[in-house]
């Protein structure tokens, strides 16, 4: 127990970030590096401690996630495996401590049901909260891209 608090304290100190878009982009990239490496301590740091809302790319559901504890992070993230890279990252500050991120993920993904997608592509939207000296992931939505589509920057809506 004491080891966990010490580890979380050290991790929090090392991962603390300024409240700006540049720091959020670095946090987003570190989060996905941690996901790919199954670095549960870092993943736990980036999870919002008030819980989260997740939109699944494999089903048509939104899920309400309770506030995480370290065991729940290990339980979930040990069931999925990823080797994905975020691209075309766009960050929009919504209020003083709330940010929207829009980006694409591409690579390989193993779902919790065991299914593997070696050509995984998703359009992702997240809401990040700046709390406790760093960015925490509160809202996660993943929309699979059709195989023939490729990630691209956000463009103006066509008004034809």
Task: Identify the function of each model-found stretch.
Residues 4-15:
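Sec-dependent N-terminal signal peptides
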Residues 11, 129-132, 136-160:
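Low-complexity, intrinsically disordered terminal/linker segments enriched in charged
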Residues 14-46, 155-160:
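Short, low-complexity N-terminal intrinsically disordered segments enriched in polar/charged residues
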Residues 21-22, 39-94, 118:
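A solvent-exposed, acidic/Ser-Thr-rich amphipathic alpha-helical stretch
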Residues 50, 103-110:
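Generic short beta-strand segments
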Residues 73, 86-92, 105-107, 123-129, ...:
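Hydrophobic/aromatic beta-strand elements that line small-molecule binding cavities or substrate pockets
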Residues 91-100, 128-135:
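A short, structured loop/turn motif at beta-sheet edges
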Residues 108-112, 146-147:
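Sequence/structural signature of outer-membrane beta-barrel proteins
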